[in-house]
Swiss-Prot record:
Family designation: Belongs to the mycobacterial PPE family.
Superkingdom, natural source: Bacteria
Organism of this sequence: Mycobacterium tuberculosis (strain ATCC 25618 / H37Rv)
Stated name of the protein: Uncharacterized PPE family protein PPE24
GO BP term, pick one: response to host immune response
More about this protein: Was identified as a high-confidence drug target.
Gene that encodes it: PPE24
Pfam families referenced in this protein's UniProt entry, alphabetically: Pentapeptide_2, PPE
Length: 1053
């Protein structure tokens, strides 16, 4: 049994339905006891022999005894060690079983899943349960995967434990001094030879009494083995029918040394026992005596556990209906399995009695999902089948349709070969009877590919008499008028508040980017070029009117959360060198903007803008990173050529009257400053400074008037006192400053306060060179968080209005010339910025109330052509630019979450179509004329003849050879009209990749019976709902689903 293809119903049920770890624990205890006994025996044996040798027994015989006893003592000690190791491996196996029992899915969960699926499928009238069915199936697939994973781990662990066991070495077989004929182990043969009785030449002779037996000494039919008495036994020394094993007395037992019917195990006495050493019926476990016990070493009825005596509760399981059920979900009596209907079932999901397998409909079945009685194999429809997927009785082979077939995929009876269609065929792929060869069509063929079929079709001599057809009167008839009623399409409104669920955009990570060092070639020269003039043609926009009263329901835009953005620290590469370059002069031509006039009388209907609420915006506190370092750098000299500014005319400007408030300057006191004596300043001289004459052109100021200015209080300057100081040198220089003639003006009278300058000296003043070097460090600073409260903009109502015609005059801009600008070569310093992390920014949802768009009509609009004159650009040279390698760090954009939002409601008005009437159509009566067909003579002729050569079957189109008729598919079929591989029977089909099946009109793999759909199905008109690659485990009559047995399960009345 391959657990990887079994559904979780079987895998979980097998794990939970067995005897559990108790038998293995008992075995571990027994091995421990055996190890102790062997060690004690070895010590005792050694002690006895040592005592004998060291005591009164002396001499050569004593030495010989000691030498002969030593290997036995060593064997006993080694066997004790091996028994102890075996006990340890048994304990490890118990741990493995407990682990798999914990890992597999509980059977009740699997049953609940399947029940939910059936309920959803039966109520899925309009497909509304499709998502729920998909979810149930997905959960079931996960259960399947969990069970297969657990069983794989269990298989691996159990295999490792089993491989660690070492076989026990055999003790010495012979003792010294025995005669040769006795030491050889064949005393009877030796005595026979000594007596002179001759032996039969050629060895033993195997004689079978019956039909279609394979092996020797069998009495009955279709046995495969030795010394079986009965029918369809697969094994040796069985007495009964349908046994798979050895030395069984009874029928349909799977195992060895059983007495009874339908036992799955060994050494059982009774009916329907699952396990070993049970006496009674429907016991599950080891060493039970009674009925319906689950566990080990129980004596009684319906007991659950180990080593109990008595009668259990009416039902010791859960969900049972009946008496003495120790399993769960049973209906009946003495059921120790789960989900059974009947009496004494130790397997699961059976309907009937004393079934030790699973999913059977019938009695005494040791296999699984059979429909019938006493089946040892799987998916059989019939009785006493030791093979699998058979339709019929007494078949030791598999996928047969018929009876007493010991081969496979046969259609017929008593076939010992494979893929035969017929009776008593010993060879393979034969059509017919008693063929011992292969691929023959016919009877008693012994070769290969013999037997052909010839056909000829001949018509007899035939004369047809004349045929008189009288006239036929057809009465008048009229088709009534047909009126199609008017069709009313009611108003439709989309459901309100269609909600779009929240979704998240996943995070996006941009990998780091490596930009290698690059240097542009020096002195790239770009020749002068001109951009051609561009003319935009005139544009005609026709008149357009929007439909009136478009209604848009209120809707809300969901809140949008922008995740925090991490900008990693970045450092520009040091010493990026940019060579000197010159930008050529650029002349922008004058631009003519023609006069434009908007169309007159643009009408905008009245409309209302709904209230708009802007939610409050929280700008969290932000802190610039500390220690932003900008290294020192040097800007090259920059030459800015002269710029000619055209005359600018400023229109008259009028400044209104204004008042200056009173200005109060407080008294300022400078304390006395004392410079210590003894400071010496060396002499120095200033060179002559020549300033060229500065000419200020005539400035014309238009006539303007100033209003009277008044002071509220008298204005006087405060007293300023400067203490005396001295300058110990003479300062002489000359300057030529031309006379400056200020324009005329007048001031009102004011008074200066007393101004006194004391004697003072100016010391030598030295200003040392000062260089501002980098780095310049700007410390961190903190911006506190601030909140902007929500702003409510109330609804604005605008009545209809008409935009007047607006005319703008033509505008012409003069040419503007930018002379060339020269920049010397310079080096950009390295700049380092610390890592910056921006906090999350949340924009709350914005709600907009429903509103109606008015009807808007715009007249046709025509724009005049717009011409852009050519632009001339002189040639210039690009400098050489060198950039070092640049590597950008990865940039990660976190996921963006968008909450659900609601779509507005849209309404369409009702539509009614007018009725349609088709007028009546009338046809008048008429009579057909009589017709006479003269006699016809058809002479005898041969239409055709053909011959089918010998081969496997007739009219087969399968890829591989098949027997039978009209078979197709992969091949290896027998019977009639089968399509697939390994099929027998009539009109069966299995999908590509599946193998086997028998019966009539079945579709699926590994099935038998009549008109079944699905894989792993037997019986009549059953339907499995699992994929064809998975066994649905269905038997019985008219069942729909999986893990079903019985009648009409999973259907509606």
């Amino acid at each position: 049994m391959n657990f990887s293809v079994l559904p979780p119903e079987i895998n979980s049920a097998l794990i939970f339905a067995g005897a559990g770890p108790e038998p293995m624990a008992a075995a571990a205890t027994a091995w421990d006891g055996l190890a102790m006994e062997l060690a004690s025996a070895a010590a005792s044996f050694g002690s006895v022999t040592s005592g004998l040798v060291g005591g009164a027994w002396q001499g050569a015989s004593s030495s010989a005894m000691a030498a002969a006893a030593a290997p036995y003592a060593a064997w006993l000690a080694a066997a004790a060690v091996q028994a102890e190791q075996t006990a340890a491996q048994a304990a490890a196996m118990i741990a493995e079983f407990e682990a798999v029992k914990t890992a597999v899915v509980q059977p009740m969960l699997v049953a609940a899943n399947r029940a939910d699926l059936v309920s959803l499928v039966m109520s899925n009238l309009f497909g509304q349960n499709a998502p729920a069915i998909a979810a149930i199936e997905a959960t079931y697939e996960q259960m399947w995967a969990a069970d297969v994973s657990a069983m794989s781990a269990y298989h691996a662990g159990a295999s490792a434990i089993a491989s660690a066991l070492s076989p026990f070495s055999k003790p010495l077989q012979n003792l010294a001094g025995l005669p040769a004929w006795l030491a050889s182990g064949a005393p009877a043969a030796a005595m026979t030879a000594a007596a002179g009785i001759p032996a039969l030449a050629g060895g033993p002779t195997a004689i079978n009494l019956g039909i279609a037996n394979v092996g020797g000494g069998n009495v009955g039919n279709a046995n495969n083995g030795l010394a079986n008495i009965g029918n369809a036994n697969l094994g040796n020394y069985n007495f009964g029918s349908g046994n798979f094993g050895n030395s069984n007395i009874g029928s349909a037992s799977l195992g060895n040394n059983n007495i009874g019917f339908g036992n799955l195990g060994s050494n059982n006495v009774g009916v329907g026992n699952l396990g070993n050493l049970n006496t009674g019926f429907a016991n599950t476990g080891l060493g039970n005596f009674g009925f319906g016990n689950t566990g080990n070493n129980n004596i009684g009825i319906g007991l659950t556990g180990n080593n109990q005596i008595g009668i259990g509760g009416l039902n010791s399981g859960t969900g049972n209906f009946g008496l003495f059920n120790s399993g769960s979900g049973n209906v009946g009596f003495f059921n120790s399995g789960n989900g059974n209907f009947g009496i004494g079932n130790s397997g699961n999901f059976n309907t009937g009695g004393w079934n030790s397998g699973h999913g059977n409909t019938g009695f005494f079945n040791a296999g699984s999902f059979n429909t019938g009685m006493l089946d040892v194999g799987n998916a059989n429809t019939g009785s006493l089948n030791t093979g699998s997927y058979n339709m019929g009785d007494f078949n030791p082979g598999s996928s047969n349709t018929g009876t007493f077939n010991t081969g496979n995929a046969n259609t017929g009876f008593l076939n010992a070969g494979n893929i035969n269609t017929g009776v008593f065929n010993i060879g393979h792929m034969n059509n017919g009877l008693f063929n011992t060869g292969d691929m023959n069509n016919g009877v008693f063929y012994r070769g290969v590919g013999q037997g052909s079929l010839q056909f000829s079709i001949t018509t007899p001599d035939l004369t047809l008499p004349p045929l008189q057809i009288p006239g036929i009167s057809v009465p008048a008839f009229s088709l009534p008028a047909i009126t199609l009623p008017s069709l009313n399409i009611p108003a439709a409104t989309t459901p309100a508040n269609i909600t779009v669920g929240a979704f998240s955009l996943p995070g996006l990570t941009l990998p780091s980017l490596n930009i290698p060092a690059a240097t542009t070639p020096a002195n790239i020269t770009v020749g002068a070029f001109s951009l051609p003039g561009l003319t935009l043609p005139s544009l005609n926009i026709p008149a357009a009117t929007t439909p009136a009263n478009i209604t848009v329901g209120a809707f809300s835009l969901p809140g949008l959360t922008l995740p925090s953005l991490n900008i990693p620290a970045a450092t520009t590469p040091a010493n990026i060198t940019v060579g000197a370059f010159s930008l050529p002069g650029l002349t922008l031509p004058s631009l003519n903007i023609p006069a434009a006039t908007t169309p007159a009388n643009i009408t905008v209907g009245a409309f209302s803008l709904p209230g708009l609420t802007l939610p409050s915006l929280n700008i969290p506190a932000a802190t610039t990173p500390a220690n932003i370092t900008v290294s020192g750098f040097q800007l090259p000299p920059l030459s800015i050529p002269s710029v000619a500014i055209p005359p600018v005319t400023v229109p008259p400007i009028t400044v209104g009257a204004f008042n200056l408030p009173p200005l109060q300057i407080p008294e300022v006191t400078i304390p006395q400053l004392t410079i210590p004596a003894g400071i010496t300043i060396g002499g120095f001289s200033l060179p002559a400074i020549h300033t060229q004459p500065i000419t200020v052109g005539q400035i014309g100021v238009g006539q303007f008037g100033l209003p009277s200015i008044g002071w509220d209080v008298f204005l006087s300057t405060p007293r300023i006192t400067v203490p005396a100081f001295g300058i110990p040198f003479t300062l002489q220089f000359q300057t030529n400053v031309p006379a400056l003639q200020p324009p005329g003006g007048g001031l009102s009278t004011f008074t200066n306060g007393a101004l006194i300058f004391g004697e003072f000296d100016l010391p030598q003043l030295v200003v040392h060179p000062y260089t501002l070097t980098g780095p310049i460090v700007i410390g961190s600073f903190f911006l506190p968080a601030f909140n902007i409260p929500g702003i409510d903009v109330p609804a604005i109502n605008v009545d209809g209005f008409t935009l007047p015609q607006i005319t703008t005059p033509a505008i012409t801009t003069p040419e503007f010339a930018i002379p060339p600008i020269g920049v010397g070569g310079f080096t950009l310093p390295q700049i380092t910025t610390q890592e910056i992390i921006t906090p999350e920014l949340t924009i709350n949802s914005i709600g907009v109330g429903g509103f109606t768009l008015p009807q808007i009509t715009t007249p046709p609009i025509t724009t005049p052509p717009l011409t852009i004159d050519p632009i001339n650009l002189t040639g210039f040279t690009l400098p050489q630019i060198t950039t070092p390698p640049i590597t950008t760090p990865p940039l990660t954009i976190d996921p963006i979450n968008l909450t659900g939002f609601t779509l507005p409601q849209i309404t369409t008005p009702p539509i009614t179509t007018p009725p349609l009437t088709i007028e009546p159509i009338g046809v008048g009566g008429f009579t057909t004329p009589p017709l006479t067909v003269p006699g016809i003579h058809l002479p005898s002729t041969t239409i055709g003849a053909f011959a089918i050569p010998g081969g496997p079957g007739y009219f087969n189109s399968s890829t591989a050879p098949s027997s039978g008729f009209f078979n197709s598919g992969a091949g290896g079929n027998s019977g009639f009209g089968n399509n697939g591989s390994g099929l027998s029977g009539w009109f069966n089909t299995n999908p590509a990749g599946l193998l086997g099946g028998s019966g009539y009109q079945n579709f699926g793999g590994l099935s038998s019976g009549f008109s079944n759909l699905g894989s792993g199905v037997s019986g009549f008109a059953n339907r499995g709902i699992l994929p064809f690659s998975v066994a649905s485990v269905v038997s019985g009559f008219a069942n729909i689903g999986t893990n079903l047995a019985g009648f009409f399960q999973g259907t509606t009345s």
